[in-house]
Amino acid sequence: KEPKTIIIDYGGPNVAKPLHVGHLRSAIIGESIKRIGRFVGHKVIGDVHLGDWGLQMGLIITELKDRKPELPYFDESFTGEYPEEAPFTISELEEIYPCASGKSKEDEAYRNEALEATHLLQQGKPGYMALWNHIMNVSVTDLKRNYDKLNVSFDLWKKESDAQPYIPGMVE
């Protein structure tokens, strides 16, 4: 038979959140299928498919704004270059998200602020996009380190946000 090109979407972690046992299962099964497919002669492409474009981003942005309102990302009149270094570590991110998620379940105003931050991010607000880039860089670096420990690798690091340019045309 002629070799096929097969794309496997496995992994599926959300950025800024730690991996859990469900991600481990998906990673091991997906990596095994990828290797078997390659062993029998197919071109198999592994895609991690990151969750990076939903409410968790708005929650993180909102919590950062509450904790560090002095950051330039939240200054509407800021016109300079945003800092190259992230204003948080992976450990801080892993603490910020559950804190923000808990607040959003108890405080409707906070949840609405996070929903608005998500919307503004998806509309391309510069300060929020800069924060999103920091979140992505810090998270993906940590994810790659963790997947390397599992001997799991991906050919593609596609993410939810990659679909953003196609959404307006699909909605119309």
Kindly label every feature range from the protein language model.
Residues 1-172:
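NTP-dependent nucleotidyl-transfer catalytic core
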